[in-house]
């Protein structure tokens, strides 16, 4: 009987976790769509191009290998 309760609680926790993850992904998708719908009227084309290029790049990652010891 205790085993059934433990399994039931585990399943409920798993379902809650999955639903929370799905809701978070949905919110992120909505944020991305809102960002894509920005009105650029009155802004120079060169600035718009730079913004779109920046948004298309993957996020920067720290690479510790680039900070190796200098051989002077």
UniProtKB/Swiss-Prot annotation:
Propeptide part(s) removed at maturation, as residue ranges: 25-35, 61-72
Any one GO CC term of this protein is: extracellular region
Keywords annotated in UniProt: Bradykinin receptor impairing toxin, G-protein coupled receptor impairing toxin, Hypotensive agent, Phosphoprotein, Secreted, Signal, Toxin
Tissue expression as described in the entry: Expressed by the venom gland.
Keyword Lyase in the entry? The reply is: no
- Tell me which domain of life the UniProt entry assigns to the organism this sequence originates from: Eukaryota
Q: Which cysteines are joined by disulfide bonds?
A: none
Report the subcellular localization. Secreted
Q: Where is the signal peptide?
A: 1-24
Question: In its UniProt record, which GO terms are filed under biological process?
Answer: regulation of blood pressure
Picking any one GO molecular function of the record gives: toxin activity
* Family per record: Belongs to the non-disulfide-bridged peptide (NDBP) superfamily.
Q: What does this protein do?
A: Agonist of the B2 bradykinin receptor (BDKRB2). Potentiates the hypotensive effect of bradykinin (BK) and induces a direct vasorelaxing effect independent of BK, by endothelium- and nitric oxide (NO)-dependent mechanisms in rat aortic ring preparations. Also exerts proangiogenic, antiinflammatory, and antifibrogenic activities.
User: What protein is this chain from?
Assistant: Hypotensin toxin Ts31
Organism for this UniProt entry: Tityus serrulatus (Brazilian scorpion)
């Amino acid at each position: 009987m205790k085993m059934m309760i433990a399994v039931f609680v585990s399943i409920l926790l798993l379902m809650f976790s999955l639903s929370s993850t799905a809701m978070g992904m949905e919110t992120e998708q909505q944020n991305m769509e809102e960002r894509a719908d920005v009105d650029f009227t009155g802004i120079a084309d060169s600035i718009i191009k730079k913004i779109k290029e920046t948004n298309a790049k993957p996020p920067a990652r720290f690479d510790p290998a680039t900070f190796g010891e200098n051989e002077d």
